Amino acid sequence: MVEKRNIFLIGPMGAGKSTIGRQLAQQLNMEFFDSDQEIERLTGADIGWVFDVEGEDGFRSREEKVINELTEKQGIVLATGGGSIKSRETRNRLSARGVVIYLDTTIEKQLVRTKRDKKRPLLQAKIPSREVLEALARERNPLYEEIADITIRANEQSAKVVAYHIISMLERN
């Protein structure tokens, strides 16, 4: 059985962090949090609005604060925003306060999973989504890899199967 330590999911948008996180929390009987949903709950506005009004820097500041507060809890599963790892403080907190699981996925899968989602501010630009996702991957993948304790390829399997694989890996560590 997996001890109740914090589990933090990182990775790009469309990797399945929220869906897999809910499955993990359910299977492990742990509390689930999504940093984007917490920001929306605290601001009373959706992420797109926060981006529009405060810009990416304002959003990242809120995100850093929310993740700091959530990672102080014990025995949680936390799905983080794809860009949360841009903050060194957030990377340090995630590494120090739990097991960091990097959900890696292909650009193709990201495109499929995000194409109808209008809540992704970084994909609302005039630049084609593929180019945006490729640029984000070049910038962020090294940061995900830097702090990951476990890396899982989250492409074809269901969230339930990926959660099962994560639990198996946690039991071995």
Swiss-Prot record:
It is found in: Cytoplasm. Transmembrane segments: none annotated. Its EC number is 2.7.1.71. ATP binds at residues 14-19, 120, 157. Binds 1 Mg(2+) ion per subunit. GO terms for molecular function: ATP binding; magnesium ion binding; shikimate kinase activity. Monomer. HAMAP family: Shikimate_kinase. This is Shikimate kinase. It comes from Baumannia cicadellinicola subsp. Homalodisca coagulata. The lineage of its organism: Bacteria, Pseudomonadati, Pseudomonadota, Gammaproteobacteria, Candidatus Palibaumannia.
